[in-house]
Structure formats: C-alpha cells, structure tokens
C-alpha cells in the first residue's frame, strides 16, 4: 500500500499518521499538513480501495484489516512507532491499531469518533445508502457536504463545493468498495475493549456535528482510561476543514502534551 511521507524536520522526529474517514482520501488532511510537518514526520495515505491504492475489497472487509494493512505498510517503510490522528472511521482504525499493535502506537487523536455507531449516525448512513442505490455516485457525492459542513460555511463557498463534487465524482471509490467500507464501520464495536487501550488519547469533537452526536465523544472519554476531550463550538463533522485554526491549535497542543511529555517520561 502506498504511503505519503514528509521529510522529518529533525533527526528522530516523532511520526504522526493521519487516517481519514469513509472517503478514504489522504488529501482530507491538507489543512493540517503545513503545521504538522514543522514538528513531525507526517504520514498520510489513500486507504485501500480508494485513490492511488485501488483494489477490490472483500465482502467481509473489516476495521481490523484496515489497521493491519496500514501497520504493515508503515513497518515496510521503516516506521515502528507512531502517533495516530483519525477522523470518524479513521478514529476506529486508530483504536484498532492501539489494541493490536500497542508497542507501536504512542498516542491517539480521535476526531468526531465513537465506540460503536450511534442510532442517529446509522440513520444518516441509511439515507445516504438509499441515495446511492437510487441516484448513484452523483447523488452520494452531492449529499455528502450536507453531513460534513455547517450550512453557513457551505453557503459562502458554493463554487468550492461544486469543484469538490466534480473531483469526488472523478475519483469515486466505487459502489461496492464504498458499501464494504461502510459495513465495516457499522460493524465496529469497541464498547467492550476500549478499556484495554493504555495509550493517551485526545478526543476532539464539534458541537454542531450533524452526523456524529457529541455524546459519542463523551462515551469515548468515559470508556478510555487515559483520555481528554475538547469540544469545538463550530465546524461540523469536518471541523478540521471548516475551522482549521481552532482545530490545529487543539491538535498541536494535544500532541505536545500527550506525546512529547509521555515519551520524555519513558
């Protein structure tokens, strides 16, 4: 699996791995790259079955498989220890990595994540699946911003959204791959295993997220033994895109306090 690695800013710089959500594209993290690359070696990638890692996914494709293939790719690239920043589905992959490869994962950041899918989130995906079946890729892509962004943010950026729609259609991961990745997301349940994650976790959520209620992050915080939660008042599900200044400040502070300080204590 192809990875994109930035140059380390200094010798033995900590590695931060960015994992996007259901869309699977590493470019989702573009608003974070410049600030992160000043202090960390940053890894981003298109998830298997998407973008520049095309493949046909098995019907029983799982979060555990997503974690395993990423870890194997990191080891092949010579990366043995890394922090994980995951958004939604990416946060699930991050928790799976922490469970399956605890010696490799230094810390986690969960952005609008959850322990197991909430009834409201499941309802949103049911609506989106019906759109996919009835209207195809175009209907899926055109509806997607409604679940990602605040209304006023979208209204002020109509040309940008049109360009994003065109790009998403051109690089659509395919109906079968999308549904198999979505099913993996829906099956994932960390409610009985989260207490085994012994790495520090920063939880970031947005209070106006239409897709994932903030209660999901509260449940994560209660279940994870070593976690801290930050709530952004604005930004929607893709809060790292819509309010990168606020998000980046939270992320950098979290990485500095949880990663550097914990490693210094080892």
From Swiss-Prot:
The gene is rutD. It holds the Pfam family Abhydrolase_1. SUPFAM superfamilies: alpha/beta-Hydrolases. GO terms for cellular component: membrane. The keyword NADP does not apply. InterPro entries: AB_hydrolase_1 (IPR000073), AB_hydrolase_fold (IPR029058), AB_hydrolase_sf (IPR050266), Pyrimidine_utilisation_RutD (IPR019913). It catalyses: carbamate + 2 H(+) = NH4(+) + CO2. It comes from Shigella flexneri serotype 5b (strain 8401). It comes from the Bacteria. Involved in pyrimidine catabolism. May facilitate the hydrolysis of carbamate, a reaction that can also occur spontaneously. Its EC number is 3.5.1.-. The keyword Hydrolase applies. This is Putative carbamate hydrolase RutD. Belongs to the AB hydrolase superfamily. Hydrolase RutD family. GO terms for biological process: nitrogen utilization; uracil catabolic process.
């Amino acid at each position: 699996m192809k990875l994109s690695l930035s140059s380390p800013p200094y010798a033995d710089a900590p590695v931060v791995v960015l994992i996007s959500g259901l869309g699977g594209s590493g470019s989702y993290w573009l608003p974070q790259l410049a600030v992160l690359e000043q202090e960390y070696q940053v890894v981003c990638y298109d998830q298997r079955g998407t973008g520049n890692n095309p493949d046909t996914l098995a019907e029983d494709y799982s979060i555990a498989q997503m974690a395993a293939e990423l870890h194997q790719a990191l080891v092949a690239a010579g990366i043995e220890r890394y922090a994980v920043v995951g958004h939604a589905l990416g946060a699930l992959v991050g928790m799976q990595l922490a469970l399956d490869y605890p010696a490799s994962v230094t810390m986690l950041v969960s952005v609008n994540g959850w322990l197991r899918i909430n009834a409201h989130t499941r309802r949103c995906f049911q609506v989106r699946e019906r759109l996919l079946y009835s209207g195809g890729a175009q209907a899926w892509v055109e509806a997607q911003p409604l679940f990602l962004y605040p209304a006023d943010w979208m209204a002020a950026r109509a040309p940008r959204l049109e360009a994003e729609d065109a790009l998403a259609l051109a690089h659509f991961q395919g109906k079968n791959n999308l549904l198999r990745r979505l099913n993996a997301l829906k099956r994932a349940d960390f409610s009985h295993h989260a207490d085994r994650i012994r790495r520090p976790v920063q939880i970031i959520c947005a209070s106006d997220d239409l897709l994932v209620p903030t209660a999901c992050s509260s449940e994560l915080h209660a279940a994870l033994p070593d976690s801290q939660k930050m709530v952004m008042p604005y930004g929607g599900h893709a809060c790292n895109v819509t309010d990168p200044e606020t998000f980046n400040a939270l992320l950098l502070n979290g990485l500095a306090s949880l990663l550097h300080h914990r490693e210094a204590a080892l």
